[in-house]
Amino acid sequence: DNRQQGYRAIAGLYTEACQIVVRADSDIRTLNDLQGKTVSIGASESGTEQNATEILKLSGLTSKLVHMVNLDYADAAGKLASGEIDALFCTAGIRTAVIEELAKECDLRLLSIDDTCLEKLLATTKEYRKYIIPANTYSGQNKDVTTIGVKAVLLASDDLSKETVEKLTETLFSHAQDLAYATSLDA
């Protein structure tokens, strides 16, 4: 059950891509190449951790085969740049600032999810959808990357009044184009 106690879903916002990032100078080219490597699966109890764990499991990569660490995006990016970790997962809208900044420090490669794993993921939950990160989204990324996407959802506390929630959604949707432009996200 994905429901969060004390909150309710207000609106679907945009699709977040599960981005799997490695250094371009590494020998990691597929998910299977993560075996024996240290991988940031996102902050503890985050959506990124959930997605990363599911992807690795369905690829046959358990915690016995991959050293999984919980790091927030900034820490993971710093450790990938310095070579302290081998890969990071980041579930966010494409053109993610932390990945763009990391690409200025070192050359990167994004990993695609293979068809077999992708089919398993899509069969696992209706929240996942196939997502293509277009070529040239990030510096040095010269080909499309196949991954999964999940819808970002705006949650509101059950304590918020109906009027406040209505005003929030009215403001959000009346400025949806501005939001999409300002954040480089697909609306």
Where are these regions (language model features)?
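Pocket-lining segment of extracytoplasmic ligand-binding domains
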Residues: 26, 62-155, 160-161
